[in-house]
Amino acid sequence: FYVPNTRSAVRINGMQRLQGEVVISDITRTHWADSYRATVAPGTTPIAGKPATELDLTATDPDNVYPTIKLWVTPDTDVPVRAQFFLASGLLFRSADFSAPVDANGRKVIRKITYRNEVEKQRASVVDILDGQPRKIPSGWFNPDTLADGQ
């Protein structure tokens, strides 16, 4: 995170909001395969009228924002359908519903994620990925001197 007139990086807390109900860790720091141990719940649960397999994810790193996540995936392809994110206290804090994957550049990607605040039920935000094209990021974006020059 860049702040003009500072010479060092400013660390952003994982619970810092990006916009609406979406926080930094929802987008950048929740790596289910690397940061969680999964246990498969028996049977299936209907989600939006379709069967889903429940995975109970337990954080392997104590610094993870969400120590526990319940994740429902399609039984045949393991595509995420819904997730519930729990705080260390056990409080259900946030949930997410995932759209069906679409083809983008020869890969299947989830285009839309709806995040819901489970404490203030009326609050929700949608992340809609409009373009899945990879882009080269200018090296100046990672240099505070270049950012200060407005380049």
Regions found by a protein language model. Give the residues of each.
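Short, solvent-exposed mixed-charge patches
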Residues: 150-151
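An acidic-aromatic
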Residues: 1-25
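Short, conserved active-site entrance elements at the starts or edges of catalytic domains
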Residues: 20-58
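Gly/Pro-enriched, hydrophobic low-complexity segments
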Residues: 14, 31, 50-144
